[in-house]
Each structure stands twice: as C-alpha cells, then as structure tokens.
Curated annotation (Swiss-Prot):
This is Glycine--tRNA ligase alpha subunit. GO terms for cellular component: cytosol. Its main location: cytoplasm. Keywords: Aminoacyl-tRNA synthetase, ATP-binding, Cytoplasm, Ligase, Nucleotide-binding, Protein biosynthesis. It is found in: Cytoplasm. Tetramer of two alpha and two beta subunits. The gene is glyQ.
Length: 308
C-alpha cells in the first residue's frame, strides 16, 4: 500500500521501516494522552540504563485545539508516530531522513531543514535538545535528544522522533484539508476519507470539551487520580527487595490527572495561578513514578552495562 495514497499506507510504511531498523512495533496506549511521549514506552523506558528501541502510533488528545471540525488542519484528536531509541545512535538523523524517503519525501528532491527548537513537557518534568524538521517550509516532525524525564536525568540519552501523521499525510497526498485525506487508498464508492472516519467525533468532542464537560466532576476526578497514584506507589514500595513497585498502575493515574487537567483548561475554569499549581501537581506524580520505575528490573535496577 503506497504511503502517498492513503493515511493507513503511511502508517504501515513507517512501521515497516522502523521494524527493519530494529524497533519493537508497539500498540497505542489505551488511555487519553496529550502526546505520544506520555506512552510509558517513552516516558518510563527513556529512564535507566537499559537499551530500548520502540515505535508506535499514539492517538493524542488536546481538548483546547478542537475547532468543531471547521478548521482544515487543527484537531482536538489526532495521531502521532513515535520512535524512541536508547541510547541514541550516532546516525539517528540519517535514519530519520531514510524514513522520509520511505514515505515518498526524498531529501535530495525536497528542501529538508532542521530548525532548532528545544522541547519541553512541563507536566512530565521533561525536556530535551531538539529540532523541528521542516520539508519545503512546513513542519513535519520533531527530533529530540531527551536530557530529563520525570525530573530525572536521562543516562544514557535517548533519541526521540515524533511525526505528526495528519500533517505529514496532507503533505504527501497534496491536500489542503485534513478531512479530505484518503484513508484506505481506494477510489470511487470504496474510498474512505479521514472525514468519513473522524469528522463527526471531532464535532461532538469539541462540544463536549468546550461546553458540556462537568467541571465539578472533573475537579473531583483530578483529586481522585492524584490520591490513587500516590496510594498505589506507597503500597507498592513495601519490601526493600521487591522489584515490582506497581509503577505502571500508578502512572496510569498520573496520565488520568494530566488529561483531566487539560479538559478543565479547555472549559476555561483554571486561572493562571491555578494552572501552574496543577502542572506542578502532575509533574510531582510523574517524578514519583519515574523514581519508582528506576527501582524495578525494567528500570535497570540490577542492570549491568558492558565492561562493568
């Protein structure tokens, strides 16, 4: 299935490319997240000394970005393609350019530029040295070397690539409206567009995010998720020799708190002062999850580097 003819073909091509370069092709995380970085395969696995290579698609939700389906390229629900390689290989940029060529954007035929743009996620306590990747004047992906995640230094440094799939697909298909994207690669009566799949949901979720979400309920959900995250970590910390700290269930609650915060923000019920307070509360949960992860086997607690 040719990547320039369908949205699903673009995804399949990226899957095949990164699988051939040693990445485990994972599935999307089954929770509401604001970006592919929130997937534990990135947030948690970027920590600790253990090598890690993974790629996956992640549905992402940013409630404030909804436009009731009336904007041709702005969505409250969209898809990111995420690649994380730890330690970051010296040829990561070449691998990225190879992926562009695989999906039909030959770097020798297009103006591909890397524009310095360091990345930060305040709620995750994460930042990295990064670049926006522009093709013929349009941003198509982000290229980051993680320095810190969950407030913890990344050692070794992990390399992350994030592709905005809708924007990339619009470029390779040559369409100006995201809802006109060919989704399945067929034509005529069998053709399915991005709008056929997602337009109604985009309209309805915009109404919910901006007009209908019960703010009192959301506030309580945030408190509940915060308490549950800390309670899980406390319960999982019993026993000094335990390498199972219940990090993943706790991190799920951190993700829930983050999404609820984003919904409250979209509803316009968070002041400037409160906003910073909520961000710090989510960041504190992420930090606790990251610290607990490093005390587990998956986090590299008993891992020995070569030569040690």
């Amino acid at each position: 299935m040719h990547p320039t003819r369908s949205f699903q073909g673009l995804i399949l091509t990226l899957h095949n490319y990164w699988a051939e370069h040693g990445c485990a092709i994972l599935q999307p995380y089954d929770m509401e997240v604001g970006a592919g970085t929130f997937h534990p395969a990135t947030t948690l696995r970027s920590l600790g000394p253990k090598p890690w290579k993974a790629a996956y698609v992640q549905p992402s939700r940013r409630p404030k970005d909804g436009r009731y389906g009336e904007n041709p390229n702005r969505l409250q629900h969209y898809y990111q393609y995420q690649v994380l390689i730890k330690p970051s290989p010296p040829n990561l940029q070449d691998l990225y350019l190879g992926s562009l060529k695989a999906i039909g954007l030959d770097p020798t035929l297009h103006d591909v530029r890397f524009v310095e743009d360091d990345w930060e996620s305040p709620t995750l306590g994460a930042w990295g040295l990064g670049w926006e990747c522009w093709c013929d004047g349009m941003e198509v992906s982000q290229f980051t070397y993680f320095q810190q995640v969950c407030g913890i230094e990344c050692s070794p440094v992990a390399g992350e690539l994030t592709y905005g799939l809708e924007r990339l697909a619009m470029y390779v298909q040559g369409v100006d409206n995201v809802y006109d994207l060919n989704f399945n690669g067929l034509e005529g009566d069998e053709k399915v567009t991005y709008g056929d799949v997602f337009l109604q949901a985009e309209q309805e979720y915009s109404r919910y995010n901006f007009e209908m979400a019960n703010t009192e309920t959301l506030h309580q959900h945030f408190i509940d998720a915060e308490r549950e995250c800390e309670a899980i970590l406390k319960a999982g910390s019993t026993g000094e020799n335990s390498l199972h700290k219940c990090v993943f269930p706790a991190y799920d609650q951190c993700i829930k708190a983050s999404h609820v915060f984003n919904l409250m923000d979209a509803r316009g019920v968070i002041s400037v002062t409160e906003r910073q307070s909520y961000i710090l509360r989510v960041r504190n949960l992420a930090r606790q999850c990251g610290e607990a992860f490093l005390l587990t086997d998956a986090g590299g607690f008993n891992f020995k580097r070569e030569g040690e």
